[in-house]
Amino acid sequence: MSVTPTANSTEEAANITASPRLWPYTEPASAIIILVVSLIILLTIVGNVLVIVAVLTSRALRAPQNLFLVSLACADILVATLVIPFSLANEIMGYWYFGSTWCAFYLALDVLFCTSSIVHLCAISLDRYWSVTKAVRYNLKRTPRRIKCMIAVVWLISAVISFPPLIMTKHDEKECLINDETWYILSSCAVSFFAPGLIMITVYCKIYRVAKQRSSTVFVAKNGLERQPSQSETCFVRKDKFEKESPSSNSSESAQRQEELDDIDLEESAASDSRARGSRFSKRRRVEGERRGPQRSCRVSWAAHQEPGSRQQQLASKSKVAQMREKRFTFVLAVVMGVFVLCWFPFFFTYSLQAVCGERCGPPEALFKLFFWIGYCNSSVNPIIYTIFNRDFRKAFKKVVCWSAQRT
């Protein structure tokens, strides 16, 4: 969001025609700022284009929910092309050069893209939550068309929040500042950042709680502890082949049981790959602990007896891979959301603080500008996060880069 508050900004704007304007930075400082921001713009565009191409061309990334990442990458590219260059010019020159009409649209686009980023992250967190808590039912509805409709709603909400207040505000020819009235600053910060951020954090805490609950169920199954599982807890165990009991030591039986339980999934087996739905036949089996009496049962779904290489085994394997991808993406997106909040929170907090108590409790102007540019830097970090934390993205990026190099 473009805000450059200065104590004497109005007075300076009035004196533009009276005396030649001096740029606020020396030539070496201006050159360094231009170089750094240009690198940020380049990194943002190249990185997010790679994300879009990777999702659209890689089989491992072609799940419908990854369309959210494509839309988020588009928002970051638009920030780099339609917002940051004009913010850079305004920063270096010390005044707005591009007229009042473009100022209104520039501010609206700035708020739009920032708001859309966090609303995208909200939608992603809700998508993850539903996929974990209502796996079978939600995944039947999780089609590309439905995801595209959700993305359209995200952009519509962002536009409704961003455009009307800014387009209706009059702007000076030589100064492009966002509405500085207290009511607008507080309401825009609440709607554009704090409320969506609170929703996002709350939903991910619930996802963590569900995952922890299911992890404890697995621990119970592996250790044979007495515990009555809740209705939502199911231990899913895959076993390729049931073996007949043979005379063996207790330790070998324990090892075998432990090996069987090592493949327990924390998510429902239909969570990510609906094509594997009819491939499992479930039966109830008690999980008994060593050296214990009768135990309470935990409902365990066993794969049917499968010959190696059978279609059922292949489908089960695909489902296992899909589930692991789903878990990895959930972790990666948690990192993305955390970094987004860390990048933008200092700006929104100090911006709101200034609205409440004015200059006396606000940070120094240089620090406020730093917070403002750190927020813009967030547009370039998502591709880096995907590369560091997700193997599927790393492979897809390498493939795209190698393919581009071969063509040239």
UniProtKB/Swiss-Prot annotation:
<keyword id="KW-1015">Disulfide bond</keyword>
<feature type="topological domain" description="Cytoplasmic">
    <location>
        <begin position="391"/>
        <end position="408"/>
    </location>
</feature>
<dbReference type="InterPro" id="IPR017452">
    <property type="entry name" value="GPCR_Rhodpsn_7TM"/>
</dbReference>
<feature type="transmembrane region" description="Helical; Name=4">
    <location>
        <begin position="148"/>
        <end position="170"/>
    </location>
</feature>
<dbReference type="Pfam" id="PF00001">
    <property type="entry name" value="7tm_1"/>
</dbReference>
<dbReference type="GO" id="GO:0051379">
    <property type="term" value="F:epinephrine binding"/>
</dbReference>
<feature type="transmembrane region" description="Helical; Name=5">
    <location>
        <begin position="182"/>
        <end position="205"/>
    </location>
</feature>
<keyword id="KW-0325">Glycoprotein</keyword>
<feature type="transmembrane region" description="Helical; Name=1">
    <location>
        <begin position="31"/>
        <end position="55"/>
    </location>
</feature>
<feature type="site" description="Implicated in ligand binding">
    <location>
        <position position="110"/>
    </location>
</feature>
<keyword id="KW-1133">Transmembrane helix</keyword>
<protein>
    <recommendedName>
        <fullName>Alpha-2Da adrenergic receptor</fullName>
    </recommendedName>
</protein>
<feature type="topological domain" description="Cytoplasmic">
    <location>
        <begin position="56"/>
        <end position="67"/>
    </location>
</feature>
<feature type="transmembrane region" description="Helical; Name=7">
    <location>
        <begin position="370"/>
        <end position="390"/>
    </location>
</feature>
<feature type="compositionally biased region" description="Acidic residues">
    <location>
        <begin position="260"/>
        <end position="270"/>
    </location>
</feature>
<feature type="transmembrane region" description="Helical; Name=2">
    <location>
        <begin position="68"/>
        <end position="93"/>
    </location>
</feature>
<feature type="disulfide bond">
    <location>
        <begin position="103"/>
        <end position="176"/>
    </location>
</feature>
<feature type="topological domain" description="Extracellular">
    <location>
        <begin position="94"/>
        <end position="103"/>
    </location>
</feature>
<dbReference type="GO" id="GO:0004938">
    <property type="term" value="F:alpha2-adrenergic receptor activity"/>
</dbReference>
<feature type="site" description="Implicated in catechol agonist binding and receptor activation">
    <location>
        <position position="188"/>
    </location>
</feature>
<keyword id="KW-0297">G-protein coupled receptor</keyword>
<feature type="transmembrane region" description="Helical; Name=3">
    <location>
        <begin position="104"/>
        <end position="126"/>
    </location>
</feature>
<dbReference type="GO" id="GO:0071881">
    <property type="term" value="P:adenylate cyclase-inhibiting adrenergic receptor signaling pathway"/>
</dbReference>
<feature type="transmembrane region" description="Helical; Name=6">
    <location>
        <begin position="333"/>
        <end position="356"/>
    </location>
</feature>
<keyword id="KW-0812">Transmembrane</keyword>
<feature type="compositionally biased region" description="Basic residues">
    <location>
        <begin position="277"/>
        <end position="286"/>
    </location>
</feature>
<dbReference type="GO" id="GO:0005886">
    <property type="term" value="C:plasma membrane"/>
</dbReference>
<comment type="similarity">
    <text>Belongs to the G-protein coupled receptor 1 family. Adrenergic receptor subfamily. ADRA2D sub-subfamily.</text>
</comment>
<feature type="topological domain" description="Extracellular">
    <location>
        <begin position="171"/>
        <end position="181"/>
    </location>
</feature>
<keyword id="KW-1003">Cell membrane</keyword>
<keyword id="KW-0675">Receptor</keyword>
<feature type="site" description="Implicated in catechol agonist binding and receptor activation">
    <location>
        <position position="192"/>
    </location>
</feature>
<keyword id="KW-0472">Membrane</keyword>
<feature type="topological domain" description="Cytoplasmic">
    <location>
        <begin position="206"/>
        <end position="332"/>
    </location>
</feature>
<feature type="glycosylation site" description="N-linked (GlcNAc...) asparagine">
    <location>
        <position position="8"/>
    </location>
</feature>
<feature type="topological domain" description="Extracellular">
    <location>
        <begin position="1"/>
        <end position="30"/>
    </location>
</feature>
<dbReference type="InterPro" id="IPR000276">
    <property type="entry name" value="GPCR_Rhodpsn"/>
</dbReference>
<keyword id="KW-0807">Transducer</keyword>
<feature type="topological domain" description="Cytoplasmic">
    <location>
        <begin position="127"/>
        <end position="147"/>
    </location>
</feature>
<feature type="topological domain" description="Extracellular">
    <location>
        <begin position="357"/>
        <end position="369"/>
    </location>
</feature>
<feature type="glycosylation site" description="N-linked (GlcNAc...) asparagine">
    <location>
        <position position="15"/>
    </location>
</feature>
<dbReference type="InterPro" id="IPR002233">
    <property type="entry name" value="ADR_fam"/>
</dbReference>
